[in-house]
Amino acid sequence: MKGHDSFMREALRQAQRALEAGEVPVGAVVVHGGHLVGVGFNQPILSEDPTAHAEIVALRDAARTLDNYRLSGATLYVTIEPCLMCAGALVHARVGTLVYGAAEPKTGAVRSAMRALDHPSLNHRVAVVANILEDECRGMIQEFFAARRHAANKEM
């Protein structure tokens, strides 16, 4: 069975697809029973859908693959710590484990800016594993935003 690094590399490949599409490079995959059942990359601009974050796209793909919106026992791998919307989707989908690459200090809703998955009112708990391939995950998004800032400065 593949380990965390291997599945996170799959998520990084999805993030590369987002980058190539001009989107913020975030990628996600869903694994169930050791098998890849869902993939997604960040695509709100491409799809004109503000909810089309990598995690949501991957959860939707997995739900279609498994013919069930409840993804009990599944693990979601994502390159960057999920936002509040995506953290909520993990709970609603009953995902068993979240594995993320790099923290998101401004909007990370799992450990950084808030701890949404720890709220006592939730009816489902998601186990969390952080910092898998952290340098690669952080590096991809930092390079993206550095290039954007550089391009914006050239236009001034």
Question: Where is each model-derived feature located?
Answer:
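Zinc-dependent deaminase
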Residues: M1-A18, G33, M85-M156
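A cytosolic small-molecule/anion-sensing beta-strand core signal
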Residues: H32-G33, R60, S72
